[in-house]
């Protein structure tokens, strides 16, 4: 089986009140040593009810999301998308859970810190998700909090497509048609960043022939979303615009914390 069926049921010693446990956590697994520190943090958090390990296929695979939806029993699902150790901030899960309940949001993501292989720790402030935020590489970070009910609704779709790479992206677009993912502007965790390339290099990964299969899936998911919101425009469905005699230059100013 491509998914580990191993789950950690928290003991009474680590759960102060089982009635208050409202999060099931799903983290990628490669070895017991790799998940040890992350597992220890989660087991000590009273908000956590169960911890499940994902093996081999990640949340980009539709079957993985189906597996998660079948096993999640708590009100919310915490999805961690990296193999590196997750370092949660002080009461991070409490903050996420409180904001989720107060705002009635379906999906939340938060600002965080990143640590590069050389040990440098830097803040990673994110931006709010807008209706037009349809890029598959829109930065959400590696920690996502989802309402379990909306994940089950997504899986229960009659026209659910089977993806190898684009399932989590498709889920985000599905949720955005109901309620935009909520940006929590608090630095709630620290993640390790192994890809230290400049942002100008990363943004062209989609044209790399090695990523062709992945990119085609992302395009299909995006096209389905645009059709669902009546925003899809076929290439031959518009009138040709006459050229004007004047030329205008447009300058955009921006501020970036990173090169």
What are these regions (language model features)?
Residues 85, 90-123:
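Conserved donor NDP-sugar-binding/catalytic core segment of glycosyltransferases
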Residues 150, 161-187, 192, 222:
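A short, conserved alpha-helix in the catalytic core of glycosyltransferases
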Residues 15-19, 38-51:
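Short, acidic, metal-binding catalytic loop of nucleotide-sugar glycosyltransferases
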Residues 121-146, 150:
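A recurrent flexible, glycine/aromatic-enriched loop bordering the glycosyltransferase active site
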Residues 1-18, 204-258:
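C-terminal, non-catalytic tails of nucleotide-sugar-dependent glycosyltransferases
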């Amino acid at each position: 089986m491509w998914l580990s069926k191993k789950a950690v049921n928290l003991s009474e010693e680590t759960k102060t009140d089982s009635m208050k446990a409202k999060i099931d956590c799903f983290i990628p697994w490669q070895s017991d040593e790799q998940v040890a520190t992350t597992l220890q943090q989660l087991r000590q958090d009273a908000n956590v009810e169960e911890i499940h390990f994902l093996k081999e296929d990640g949340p980009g695979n539709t079957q993985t999301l189906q597996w998660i939806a079948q096993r999640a029993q708590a009100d919310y699902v915490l999805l961690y998308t990296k193999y590196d150790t997750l370092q949660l901030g002080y009461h991070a899960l409490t903050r996420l859970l409180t904001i989720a309940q107060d705002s009635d949001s379906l999906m939340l993501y938060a600002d965080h810190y990143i640590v590069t292989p050389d040990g440098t720790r830097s803040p990673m402030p994110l931006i709010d998700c807008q209706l037009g935020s349809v890029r598959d590489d829109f930065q959400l970070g590696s920690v996502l909090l989802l309402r379990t009910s909306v994940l089950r609704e997504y899986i229960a779709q009659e026209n659910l497509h089977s993806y190898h790479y684009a399932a989590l992206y498709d889920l985000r677009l599905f949720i955005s048609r109901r309620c935009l993912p909520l940006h929590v502007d608090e630095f709630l965790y620290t993640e390790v960043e192994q890809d230290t390339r400049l942002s100008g290099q990363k943004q062209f990964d989609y044209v790399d022939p090695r990523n062709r299969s992945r990119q085609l899936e992302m395009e299909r998911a995006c096209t389905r979303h645009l059709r669902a919101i009546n925003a899809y425009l076929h290439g031959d469905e518009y009138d040709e615009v006459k050229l004007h005699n004047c030329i205008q230059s447009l300058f955009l100013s921006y501020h970036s914390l990173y090169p």
